[in-house]
Amino acid sequence: MQHGGALRADQLHQRAEADIREREALTELGDFAKPYGVRIAFENIFTTEPGQYRQTPAEVAETVKAVNHPNVVALIDFSHAYIESTYKGLNFREQIAAMAPVTGHLHVHDSFGRPQAFYKAFHPQENTAMGIGDLHMPLGWGDIDWDSIFAELDFLPNTVMMMEIGPRHRSEQPESLAIARRLAKLDQLQSVAAQ
């Protein structure tokens, strides 16, 4: 798993060069992984500071397509995609649909897609109460429409789904695992792993 890079607002003029370096690095990682039968999963992430450059989910898909390496796939983190789409005023469903054809790994956890922005909570429970940030909540606790997403999208063969439910929700993990298994059947995914 590899998160995409970031540029600060004062570095935005370097965007094209940074994207080229990232593609070259992913190609090198793919070449290294190939003899071991391992896939490098390039994960979408969300903006963490004003003016920052992060690739949107659709741009992550374009990067994976440009790299065009059998050992480099996209990783959809649904909550990250939801947060970034909200922050940038993009259509969440269109963004993940752009990633799906090159996706070989999924991270599932729920949220409301509201960016953390400038609010810094004193306790994690505050973010949950207000529904902001990367909450890593059990499936069904946020407002991601899991059923329609998995009914509509097709991923690469042998795609791995991994739950990323936060440790404070450990008692809810069995129910989330049951939901994840049902979702995997909707899309014919090969395996489900719990964290």
Regions found by a protein language model. Give the residues of each.
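Active-site acidic/histidine proton-transfer and metal-coordination neighborhood
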Residues: M1-V73
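Histidine-acidic metal/acid-base catalytic patches
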Residues: E28, P57, A61-Q195
